[in-house]
Amino acid sequence: KNLNLKKFYRAKFIEQQQRHLKYHESSYALEPNIKEAPGGLRDLNILIWVLRAAHLGNTWQEVFKKGLITRRECELLESVTKSLYRLRIHMHLLTNRHEDRLIFEIQEPLAKALGIVGTVGRRPSEVMMQHFYVNAKTIGQLNSIILQAIKERYSKEPEQTGEPICSGFVRQGDVLGLESPDVFVKNPERILEAFLIQERHPDIPMKSSRLYRALFEAHSLMNKEWAENPVNRQTFLKIIQGRRGVWHALEEMNRWGVLGKLLPSFNRIVGQMQHDLFHAYTVDQHTLLAIRYLRNFTHSENAHELPLCTDCLLYTSPSP
């Protein structure tokens, strides 16, 4: 039976979006569901199902040979897949039941069963959870790259060269793209500009696979010199001084590892979980959520909720 790839892709894409919303678009919870939450096994399943439907392979190696992913992406996908299945099997053995939630009570014994040792000031369970969050982030990044690449390859819409929107960037409908794959390599200052552009243009919410992949490969470009570059610091100030979309921009920067490269102190808390019941998310997620709530108080439509907070945040001292 012939499968309508476009309909199948759309159905799976919507299914994934709805599932992510159910888990509040986050895998960085105290007790993440390693199968259903964003960055979990189901996100890998979605990729394989769509790739198989597109006749692009049944394994990551086959997909690599078809040219849709790079060798590094293939190796990472194999690694995170193996890691998640190993974690899930040990969870089932430890609980003696079908359990896909990394519940608080089993995190410490699970870490010991996996042979994970703690470090100074960190329990084995905290080390294990940070490994999980890093893998979940990697899966989320690769999921975005591959799904967008499939959409672009098999879309029946006429190919768009893109309308120049800023030096190095083009607009393709509601998608932000790059003029060439090496835009960031030639000028690493463009990395932060990608987030500034989307903050200022909420009508361009999507990124092209070329832009996704360029961000994924940009880590080696974001060194100490890059972080201390006055141009990059100025661009970052423009982002956090924006009237709208600041939290979303910071969330995206964190998702692609840019925020931690720009702010080394922030990088140390990425994926860091405290082994107690008082913290529902990782430290980096708590920090970003705090910023989100503070930003909400600056919007007049939210002033009725906590008027004192709004007054304090919007207060400007009188001129002397």
Where are these regions (language model features)?
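Non-catalytic interface/linker regions that flank or bridge core catalytic/transmembrane domains
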Residues: 1-279
